[in-house]
């Protein structure tokens, strides 16, 4: 199975998608979800530190999980139901 990475041109539809799923937030929790097979899709913030996003992106390739990019950390955090920014999140349902 091939991994599909993309930067979306329809940011709002991706953020709506995030908000409709149960998610884990943060690099450490996301890595655990990938390793356990619970992650269904990963979301990364464009303005997040590449030191955080690049290893997660590599893990997505390793585990054959789609990876979508969202406009910024604050929007990703809000879509996940938290009031602070998030560099990474994963849909787990």
Predicted features and spans:
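Amphipathic coiled-coil/heptad-repeat helices and related helical stalk/stem segments
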Residues: 26-27, 52, 72
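A short, structure-level motif marking secondary-structure boundaries and short turns
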Residues: 15-16, 40-43, 91
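Fold-independent oxyanion-binding glycine-rich loops
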Residues: 27, 46, 92-93
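Short, flexible micro-motifs
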Residues: 29, 40, 80, 84
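A short linear-motif detector with a strong N-terminal bias
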Residues: 2-3, 21-23, 45-47, 66-71
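N-terminal positively charged helical leader segments and presequences
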Residues: 32-58, 64
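Short basic, glycine-rich beta-strand/loop surfaces that mediate nucleic-acid
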Residues: 58-93
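Ribosome large-subunit tunnel/peptidyl-transferase-proximal elements
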Residues: 2-38
């Amino acid at each position: 199975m091939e991994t599909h990475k993309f930067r979306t041109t329809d940011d709002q539809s991706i953020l709506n998608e995030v908000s409709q799923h149960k998610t884990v937030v943060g690099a450490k929790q996301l890595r655990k979800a990938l390793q356990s097979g619970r992650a269904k899709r990963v979301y990364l913030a464009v303005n997040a530190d590449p030191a955080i996003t690049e290893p997660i992106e590599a893990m997505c390739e390793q585990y054959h999980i789609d990876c979508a990019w969202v406009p910024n950390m604050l929007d990703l955090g809000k879509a996940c139901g938290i009031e602070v920014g998030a560099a990474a999140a994963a849909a787990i349902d």
